[in-house]
């Protein structure tokens, strides 16, 4: 299973082609659009999300509500393109027209791809870099993840997310499954404790008023995974390695951990390893889940717990110092419309990126041409956990 996205932030549309989805999977576009809507929300979002109405159009690979087994193409229209048609269109424009529109960027923003991307691809107008490196591309990745969540639901695998920390203000590290699921999306910062939610809003407002931005930590949980997905045999087949690569490929994500993560370094092994237990109903299970459902690069049947660290968004309304690439003079960096905090939205993006990595790993483990075949193999693997 793989996908390829295309499109620029202010171009006409984002397009994604997904290959490897089994045939006969029931897909409703409203299910995908419901997930797309979640990405647009969250306290601290900028004006761009008031312009866009992200909805997906499926243009191939699905017929009469069911996948065909062929590549699935989805399109997300950029409504803001109406204001950028001339500058972002494919047709050539004159230097005079470009200058009159004041859209050329020569002052790179610290923390963005602007300067290094301009060097790498020889772009003197850094808009050519920022348009593709923008987090707008994550809308297409959420569409892919939403499709994967439909697949996972058919396999009785649940995936959900929350915010753990914003700007140094922390929610509890872990909640039991029922509390977690019962409180999803209860507020606009996606934390479970309402008192902490208000403190986070105040912190976001403070950053916005200062022309600054703040980051945080998000958590994704995958429940009811069959055992043995991934492999200890080769480095590139380890499930935690694949999930980690997916998470840190999200714009502004700078770290990832599993289970107790970096706190494991503070404790002795006797407090971190999860003891193995058995009963006839569950089969093998663990007495705790400090390792986050992963052992030896494989799922062990316990919930997979993924923690992702997002740095503050580098576009600031109180811009940092930079250098004009044409004149080499010191300037304040270019200001582009942006969010003061995108951590709540990033938790949704992270959830869908993990959903893709899980679905991809499952389809490699249980190679299937159609959904019925895949379901049967999953049933057999779950039974193995009891009978082994």
Swiss-Prot record:
Q: Name one GO biological process term.
A: aromatic amino acid family biosynthetic process
Identify the cofactor(s).
FMNH2
Pfam families, per the entry: Chorismate_synt
Q: Provide the alphabetized UniProt keywords.
A: Amino-acid biosynthesis, Aromatic amino acid biosynthesis, FAD, Flavoprotein, FMN, Lyase, NADP
Q: Which domain of life is it from?
A: Bacteria
Q: Which residues bind NADP(+)?
A: 39, 45
Q: What InterPro entries is this protein classified in? A: Chorismate_synth, Chorismate_synth_AroC_sf, Chorismate_synthase_CS
How many cofactors are bound and how?
Reduced FMN (FMNH(2)).
Pathway-wise, it operates in: Metabolic intermediate biosynthesis; chorismate biosynthesis; chorismate from D-erythrose 4-phosphate and phosphoenolpyruvate: step 7/7
Q: Which residues bind FMN?
A: 132-134, 251-252, 296, 311-315, 337
Q: What class of enzyme is it?
A: lyase
E.C. number: 4.2.3.5
Q: Name one GO cellular component term.
A: cytosol
Q: Which reaction does it catalyse?
A: 5-O-(1-carboxyvinyl)-3-phosphoshikimate = chorismate + phosphate
UniProt lists the family membership as follows: Belongs to the chorismate synthase family.
Main role?
Answer: This reaction introduces a second double bond into the aromatic ring system.
- What subunit structure does UniProt give? Homotetramer.
Q: Which HAMAP family match?
A: Chorismate_synth
In its UniProt entry, what is this protein called? Answer: Chorismate synthase
> What is the scientific name of the source organism?
Staphylococcus aureus (strain bovine RF122 / ET3-1)
Q: What's the source species' lineage?
A: Bacteria, Bacillati, Bacillota, Bacilli, Bacillales
The gene that this protein is the product of is aroC
């Amino acid at each position: 299973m793989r996908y390829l996205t295309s499109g620029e932030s202010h171009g006409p549309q984002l397009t994604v082609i997904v290959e490897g989805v089994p045939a006969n999977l029931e897909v409703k576009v409203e299910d995908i659009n419901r997930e797309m809507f979640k990405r647009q929300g969250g306290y601290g979002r900028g004006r761009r999300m008031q312009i866009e109405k992200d909805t997906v159009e499926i243009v191939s690979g699905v017929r009469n509500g069911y996948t065909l087994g062929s590549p699935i193409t989805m399109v997300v229209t950029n409504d803001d393109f109406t204001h950028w048609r001339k500058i972002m269109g494919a047709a050539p424009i004159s230097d005079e027209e470009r200058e009159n529109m004041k859209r050329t960027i020569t002052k790179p923003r610290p923390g963005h791809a602007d300067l290094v991307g301009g060097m790498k691809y020889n772009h003197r107008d850094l808009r050519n870099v920022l348009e593709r490196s923008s987090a707008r591309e994550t809308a297409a990745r959420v569409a892919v993840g939403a499709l994967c969540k439909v697949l996972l639901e058919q396999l009785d695998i649940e995936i959900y997310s929350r915010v753990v920390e914003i700007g140094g203000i922390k929610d509890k590290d872990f909640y039991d499954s029922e509390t977690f699921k019962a409180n999803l999306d209860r507020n606009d910062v996606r934390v479970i404790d309402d008192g902490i939610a208000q403190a986070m809003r105040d912190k976001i407002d403070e950053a916005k008023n200062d022309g600054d931005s703040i980051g945080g930590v998000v958590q994704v949980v995958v429940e009811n995974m069959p055992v043995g997905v991934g492999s200890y045999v080769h480095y590139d087949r380890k499930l935690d390695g694949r999930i980690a690569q997916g998470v840190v490929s999200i714009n502004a994500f700078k770290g990832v951990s599993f289970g107790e993560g970096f706190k494991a370094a503070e404790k002795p092994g006797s407090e971190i390893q999860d003891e193995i237990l058995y009963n006839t109903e569950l089969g093998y299970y663990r007495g705790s889940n400090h390792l986050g459902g992963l052992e030896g690069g494989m799922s062990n049947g316990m919930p997979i717990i993924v923690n992702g660290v997002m740095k503050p968004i580098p576009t600031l309304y109180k811009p940092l110092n930079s250098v004009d690439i044409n004149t080499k003079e010191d300037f304040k960096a270019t200001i582009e419309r942006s969010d003061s905090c995108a951590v709540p939205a990033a938790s949704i993006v992270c959830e869908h990126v993990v959903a893709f990595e899980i679905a991809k790993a499952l389809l490699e483990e249980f190679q299937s041409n159609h959904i019925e075949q895949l379901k049967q193999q999953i049933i057999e693997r779950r039974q193995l956990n009891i009978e082994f």
